Amino acid sequence: MRPEDKKKVVEDLHVRAEKAKLAILTDFRGLNVAAMSELRKGLRAASAEYQVVKNTLMTLAIEGTDLEVLKDELKGPCAVCLAYEDPVEPTKALTEFAKNNKKFEIKIGVLDGKLVNLDGLKALADLPPREVLLGQIAGTLNSLPTGLVQCLAGVPRKLLYALQAVRDQKEAA
């Protein structure tokens, strides 16, 4: 690759690294073209992209970004998955792909500028999508006022029942 081409790759990757909310390093050795195409297609559907980049170029590209913590992890053949929206969906796609392709290995990830190990990535993959989580939170927040109203209305209701019982008792006597 010519130096001008390398510079362009670094600049392009730097821009994408700045926008990425999540980055996951993988070992792609042993994957054929069809498997790589399948993986890329699944990641595109999850608003992410997958690229094989030389470690030296990747090191230059992530300088000054949240992904800079990956510098020490760039050893051996690496490919990077960059997610720009919900970090859960691409992580799910990668872990599913790793289950189905024994040669594919997830190394480590970065979320919000912090390294996330394989166990953390698996836990992230088990989370429901962002929209579902927001719906659960909204439902919980909505149930709090409803429960409070029910609780507050219970005291006068019980008083009315007691008064009704006293009235019925006096009428019967």
UniProtKB/Swiss-Prot annotation:
Keywords: Ribonucleoprotein, Ribosomal protein, RNA-binding, rRNA-binding
Gene this chain is encoded by: rplJ
GO molecular function, one term: large ribosomal subunit rRNA binding
Stretch forming the signal peptide: none
Family: Belongs to the universal ribosomal protein uL10 family.
Annotated Gene Ontology cellular component terms: large ribosomal subunit
InterPro entries (UniProt xref): Ribosomal_uL10, Ribosomal_uL10-like_sf, Ribosomal_uL10_bac, Ribosomal_uL10_bac_type, Ribosomal_uL10_CS_bac
Taxonomic source organism: Desulfatibacillum aliphaticivorans
HAMAP family reported in the protein's UniProt record: Ribosomal_uL10
GO-annotated biological processes: translation
Record bears the keyword Ribosomal protein: yes
Pfam families: Ribosomal_L10
Name of the protein this chain belongs to: Large ribosomal subunit protein uL10
Cited function: Forms part of the ribosomal stalk, playing a central role in the interaction of the ribosome with GTP-bound translation factors.
Assembly, per entry: Part of the ribosomal stalk of the 50S ribosomal subunit. The N-terminus interacts with L11 and the large rRNA to form the base of the stalk. The C-terminus forms an elongated spine to which L12 dimers bind in a sequential fashion forming a multimeric L10(L12)X complex.
